[in-house]
């Protein structure tokens, strides 16, 4: 029994050591993940997006397909594209990829591998008044509503004359799309710039709101809105590398 207790203690020590190592190199890990996710940097100057074989693979974090430098596809965008097609094919590939990532990593993806999560943390470091989210815990349930309706149901149920649904989250909600996709493409591509309209204005307003809130609150989009975070939060309970908050 003593030997067993000692073993459990040793396992706890190893777990704490691993956690400290991850925390120490967290900034480097996030920077590396962001660079790998957006490796095609020359495309920013070209005003075009990468369309190679890598776009058939989903990246783990929230990263827009339309970003000129994006090396892979956004899982949320990919899922909506498939379920919103005129033939409605359930996206087994994307769902399977998300489940695999969720089981293996859980919300580790949100804290270490997501470019937009990292951006919010950097914004929160801007000096100024900070507000707590403790009294706003009820808002954390919004992201599950967004996941169910904006990502799954609306693209399937609200369709046009040929039976195709809009990617509602990507089109009307996601601030990462306008930050990584619309803005850099419009800067470098006159044709895209001339085509910008009311939808771009709306998405830009959403982005500005998220930026302002990120300075005041810690990762507000992740906590309250992100459907990808909602999915990983559900999987975090069974993940091999879960994120736990210390009692202290």
Model-based region annotation:
Residues 2-248:
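Non-ligating segments of multi-cofactor redox enzymes
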């Amino acid at each position: 029994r003593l030997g067993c207790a000692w073993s459990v203690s040793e396992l706890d020590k190893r777990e704490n050591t691993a956690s400290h190592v991850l925390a120490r190199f967290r900034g480097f890990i996030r920077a590396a993940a962001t660079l790998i996710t957006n490796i095609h940097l020359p495309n920013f100057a070209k005003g075009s997006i990468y369309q190679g074989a890598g776009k058939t693979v989903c990246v783990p974090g929230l990263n827009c397909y339309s970003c000129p430098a994006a090396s892979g596809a956004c899982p949320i965008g990919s899922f909506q594209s498939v379920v919103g097609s005129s033939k409605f094919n359930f996206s087994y590939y994307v769902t399977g990829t998300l489940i695999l990532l969720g089981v293996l990593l859980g919300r580790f993806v949100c804290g270490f591998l997501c470019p937009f999560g990292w951006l919010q943390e950097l914004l929160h470091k801007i000096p100024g008044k900070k507000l707590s989210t403790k009294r706003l815990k009820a808002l954390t349930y919004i992201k599950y509503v967004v996941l169910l309706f904006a990502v799954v149901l609306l693209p399937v149920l609200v369709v046009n004359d040929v039976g195709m649904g809009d990617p509602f989250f990507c089109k009307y909600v996601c601030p990462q799309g306008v930050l990584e996709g619309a803005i850099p493409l419009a800067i470098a591509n006159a044709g895209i710039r001339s085509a910008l309209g009311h939808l771009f204005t709306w998405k830009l307003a959403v982005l500005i709101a998220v930026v302002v809130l990120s300075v005041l609150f810690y990762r507000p989009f992740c906590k309250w809105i992100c459907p990808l975070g909602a999915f990983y939060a559900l999987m975090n309970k069974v993940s091999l590398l879960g994120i736990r908050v210390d009692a202290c």
